[in-house]
């Protein structure tokens, strides 16, 4: 097919003129419209920047959460001996001690539930595990305190 003669030829000059006209139209827009558009864009940018700024701070502060018993050890110490302090090294040792005992009791309770072919570790398995892991009088006190705690939890 032959090109129609009525069509304007697409030349480099024609496309440049179209680009100049588009730029002139953009410049001809009132300043109020541009200011309004900027005002609309700026809050979005600020909102986007603020969480990012906070995010950077959070990234710096964010560490893996290590759960310890230090606060609870300190509270019990103050209940028993209000005028006594504890060094950080002693606190670390106490925390390790509690973690070790917890692991031993949990392992023993898990074994007991497997022996009984039960999928759930109940308070009964925990109680038996405490009796097996802790010696004599300490086991009796631990069982009575545990029973008291479970009763308090279930009733209230």
Swiss-Prot record:
Organism name: Chlamydomonas reinhardtii (Chlamydomonas smithii)
Family note: Belongs to the histone H2B family.
Keyword Protein biosynthesis: no
Top-level taxon of the source organism: Eukaryota
A Pfam family the protein falls into: Histone
Ranges of Basic and acidic residues composition bias in the record: 1-10, 24-58
Glycyl lysine isopeptide (Lys-Gly) (interchain with G-Cter in ubiquitin) crosslink location in chain: 152
Subunit description: The nucleosome is a histone octamer containing two molecules each of H2A, H2B, H3 and H4 assembled in one H3-H4 heterotetramer and two H2A-H2B heterodimers. The octamer wraps approximately 147 bp of DNA.
GO molecular function: DNA binding; protein heterodimerization activity; structural constituent of chromatin
Signal peptide: none
Lineage of source species: Eukaryota, Viridiplantae, Chlorophyta, core chlorophytes, Chlorophyceae
Modified residues (N6-acetyllysine): 40-41
A GO CC term attached to the entry: nucleus
Role description: Core component of nucleosome. Nucleosomes wrap and compact DNA into chromatin, limiting DNA accessibility to the cellular machineries which require DNA as a template. Histones thereby play a central role in transcription regulation, DNA repair, DNA replication and chromosomal stability. DNA accessibility is regulated via a complex set of post-translational modifications of histones, also called histone code, and nucleosome remodeling.
SMART domains: H2B
Subcellular location: Nucleus; Chromosome
UniProt protein name: Histone H2B.2
Keyword line: Acetylation, Chromosome, DNA-binding, Isopeptide bond, Nucleosome core, Nucleus, Ubl conjugation
InterPro entries: Histone-fold, Histone_H2A/H2B/H3, Histone_H2B, HISTONE_H2B_site
PTM annotation: The N-terminus is blocked. Can be acetylated to form H2BK33ac and H2BK34ac. Acetylated mainly on the ubiquitinated form.
Annotated region described as Disordered, given as residue ranges: 1-63
PANTHER family: HISTONE H2B (PTHR23428)
């Amino acid at each position: 097919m032959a090109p129609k003669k009525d069509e304007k030829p697409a030349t480099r000059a024609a496309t440049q003129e179209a680009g100049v006209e588009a730029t002139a139209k953009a410049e001809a827009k009132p300043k109020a419209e541009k200011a309004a558009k900027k005002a609309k864009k700026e809050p979005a940018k600020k909102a986007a920047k603020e969480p990012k700024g906070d995010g950077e701070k959070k990234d710096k502060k964010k560490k893996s959460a290590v759960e310890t018993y230090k606060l609870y050890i300190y509270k019990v110490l103050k209940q028993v001996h209000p005028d006594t302090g504890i060094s950080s090294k002693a606190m670390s040792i106490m925390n390790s001690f509690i973690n070790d005992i917890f692991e031993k009791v949990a392992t023993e309770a898990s074994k007991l539930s497997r022996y009984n072919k039960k999928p759930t570790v109940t308070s009964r398995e925990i109680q038996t595990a405490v009796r097996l892991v802790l010696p004599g009088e300490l086991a009796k006190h631990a069982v009575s305190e545990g029973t008291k705690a479970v009763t308090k939890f279930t009733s209230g």
